[in-house]
Amino acid sequence: DKAKAFNKLGLNGFQISYEINSIKIELKKEVLENIDNLIICIPPSGFSNYDQIVGSIVTCFNAKTKIIFTSSTGVYEEINGEVTEDSNKTKDHPVFLAEQKLRELAVDRLTILRLAGLIGDNRHPVKYFIQKDLIPNCNAPVNLVCQKDVIRAIELILEKQLFSKTYNIVNPSHPSKKDYYMNASKALSNGNPKAEFGAGGKLVLGTKFEDEAGFKYNFPIDDWNELRKTNEYR
């Protein structure tokens, strides 16, 4: 159904099916070998061998295909303080393992985007806190980014051919979880979840991409009027 939806938009939508040790892509080999850019946006949930699946997809394409992999800022170790692309990672995190697999296969034509928590159309983490009626570790900073800014970042990477890179993609606004989610709950659902204090948390910096690509985040994470239009919270 999703492939058909892409086709209606004038795109070449096709299905990828997978088994434990194999990948099947419903597209002719000669088409795969002539694709210039591959963007991998597959979440790790539901996979016991996520790194192998992602690696197998890459091997279906030619050795010149440029790759953008949407990773996660969740790969960083839990610390109190600022985090950059060079900070310590959780070595057994499935997404970090996938990063390593892709580097083995395509290091010079691969760019990794470590995305912060995504907000956008019908997607906002405040839903979880409203359901639980609790904001844990409320003094930790939020690390979020709007989906539209992620799309803009990908477009800029393709335009400027910024490959063999790793970037954090995260909005520079980092209020505390308490301040942000209390305001979000009131603005979007008239909720009032309880705040639970904790040990603090990491503040992920995205300045490397801003500096190297000349990128500016256009979509604020606290535009409640816009978020109210595109989300249902009750």
Give, region by region, the residue ranges found by the protein language model:
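Substrate-positioning beta->alpha
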Residues: 112-118, 125-127, 134-158
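Conserved Rossmann-fold cofactor-binding substructure of NAD(P)-dependent oxidoreductases
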Residues: 7-35
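Amphipathic terminal alpha-helices
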Residues: 221-234
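NAD(P)-cofactor binding segment of oxidoreductase domains
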Residues: 25-69, 97-101
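Short-chain dehydrogenase/reductase
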Residues: 83-102, 140-145, 174
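Conserved beta-loop-beta element that borders a ligand/cofactor-binding pocket
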Residues: 100-121
